[in-house]
Amino acid sequence: MTRTQILSALIAAAPLAGCAMPAPASAPPSSATAQEAFWQALSNHCGKAYAGGLASTDARDADWAGKRMVAHWAACDEARVAIAFHVADPEAAAGWNRSRTWIVTRSGEGAATRFTLKHDHRHADGEADAVTFYGGTSTDAGTARAQDFPVDGESVALFTREGLDASLTNVWRVAVDPAAQADARFVYQLTRRNDPTRLFRVEFDASTTITAPPAAWGW
């Protein structure tokens, strides 16, 4: 092969060699923060309803034992998820107490994202209860499946005014599995920092949907 032929072959092969070179290593995909994963897990239940019941055994909650309960993702948007909590009650209209709605909102971005849980309590006519819209805001990243909500100052003032001193150290927890998970659960829990014996916990089977109930009172 002449020098001219060799040079021509090298020039022709150059583009192919360039294509064959390994691509530069790309940065590994950034994983979702715990907050992003939690919000996604909570949000992907929107519109669904699940059956559940009392899972704790605190004697103070004896009147809740054995009652049918339903959690219904009644309203959702990019910054808010409202979950109606229905409790079977033979003394309530149509046999159900529909007075409670848990409202979780998000604020901030990325690792600075925080969540706030508020309790919307209504009477059967839709009017707000004297003790309503209490709750707290998460103080750390939490986990992809659970967030804790220590009682906030606004709620402390409300509880103090209403003589609910036992609630001044409330810590609520919301735990949720993604809707696609085979054994998915949804949990609402209450504990108190000054009372290690206090535990109120309701659990729902979030792997099996049920027919959505009527709207919560006032919604």
What role is predicted for each listed range?
Residues 1-8:
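Bacterial N-terminal signal peptides that target proteins for export
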Residues 66-69, 95-101, 129, 169, ...:
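Short, surface-exposed coil-to-beta transition loops
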Residues 108-163:
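An exposed acidic His-Trp-rich patch
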